[in-house]
């Protein structure tokens, strides 16, 4: 099978680096173009990254000597690839314009950015949960005047630590959710070397994160109506998002009230059996088991459990009845794999299999 030529925009940043490690030996995709800011353009990838390689695995050799292109040079990118992954660090309105320009140039965009998460006809997808939202792509193409180009996005990294578990329990009608997230420093694109003030420290604020963590799940659970996604109205979610001194892995402590209160056995069965289109299609980055539950009192732990199924599975533990709410549990996801680049690659695998890139 001939691999599809793809590009990575924002290739020099942490999420861009993660994209390249995931795509280096991909069965469907071949990275043929790397793009970044104008100041990196013309340099080799190795030169452009310099001493800013942020991952604990080495830079794939095959990309080191590739020449970086200016992300704004869409004509040049179009000669080299026909799908792009986007992880640029720019102002939101600039990202919105850039992604739309690529889509209008008939290059589908799979984005890690938040700029288009609330554009009504742009699907914001966790592939196991709301693949049905891909149906709005036809309407988006009409709006953009494209035959092939479109934008698909993934949601915020924080919500992957509790939304899968809540989705598996929607039949029991959760109506009130409290979630406190404990978020790794890589969520800010940083390492301890770059952010020494996070060592031995907790910062009780992450700008914009609580609004995303409360509202984005409702869009994921929304319905497609008249060519756009209409968000769900329930459950009500309130969150606090806290930065903690962990390299990777977002943890969530969650409390839930249900209209049809399930038993512990029903909850555990729902989590164990929950799977979606990626598992049915056996997509390359689909975890065999989407939600893994640990019986041990001291799990899940970021250090031990974030890399389950290559960082694409999510884990849960400490499921207990609660004296104020009905149930409480702890969830964990890998924020730069399932929550960022890995989640976007899984979306692209699904789009590829379903014919959206043809």
Positions of predicted regions on the chain:
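Charged docking surfaces used in two-component/phosphorelay signaling
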Residues: 186-358
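N-terminal Rossmann-like NAD(P) cofactor-binding subdomain of oxidoreductases
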Residues: 1-205, 235-236, 308, 314-315, ...
């Amino acid at each position: 099978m001939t691999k599809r030529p793809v590009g990575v925009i924002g290739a020099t940043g942490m999420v861009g680096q993660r994209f390249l490690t995931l795509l280096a030996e991909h069965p469907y995709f071949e990275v043929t173009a790397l793009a970044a800011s104008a100041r990196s353009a013309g340099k080799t990838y190795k030169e452009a990254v310099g001493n800013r390689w942020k991952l604990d695995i080495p830079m794939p050799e095959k990309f080191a000597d590739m020449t970086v292109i200016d992300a704004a040079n869409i004509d040049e990118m179009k000669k080299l690839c026909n799908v792009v992954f986007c992880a640029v660090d720019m102002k939101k309105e600039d990202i919105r314009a850039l992604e739309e320009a690529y889509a209008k140039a008939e290059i589908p965009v799979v984005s890690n950015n938040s700029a288009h998460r609330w554009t009504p006809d742009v699907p914001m997808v966790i592939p196991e949960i709301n693949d049905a939202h891909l149906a709005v792509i036809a309407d988006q193409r009409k709006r953009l005047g494209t035959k092939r180009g479109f934008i698909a996005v993934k949601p915020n990294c924080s919500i992957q630590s509790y939304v899968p578990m809540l989705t598996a329990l929607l039949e029991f009608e959760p109506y009130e959710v409290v979630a406190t997230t404990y978020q790794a420093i890589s969520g800010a694109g940083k390492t301890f070397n770059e952010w020494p003030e996070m060592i031995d420290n907790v910062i009780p604020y992450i700008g914009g994160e609580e609004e995303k963590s409360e509202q984005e799940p409702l869009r994921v659970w929304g319905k497609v109506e008249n060519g756009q996604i209409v968000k769900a109205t329930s459950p009500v979610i309130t969150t606090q998002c806290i930065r903690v001194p962990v390299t990777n892995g977002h943890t969530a402590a969650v409390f839930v009230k249900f209209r049809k209160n399930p038993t512990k056995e029903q909850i555990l069965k729902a989590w164990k059996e929950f799977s979606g289109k990626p598992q049915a299609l056996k997509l390359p980055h689909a975890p065999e088991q989407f939600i893994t539950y640990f019986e041990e009192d001291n799990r899940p732990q970021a250090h031990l459990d974030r890399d389950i199924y290559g960082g694409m599975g999510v884990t849960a533990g400490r499921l207990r009845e609660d004296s104020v709410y009905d149930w409480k549990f702890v969830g964990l996801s890998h924020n730069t794999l399932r929550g960022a680049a890995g989640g976007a690659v899984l979306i692209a695998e699904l789009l590829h299999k379903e014919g959206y890139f043809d």
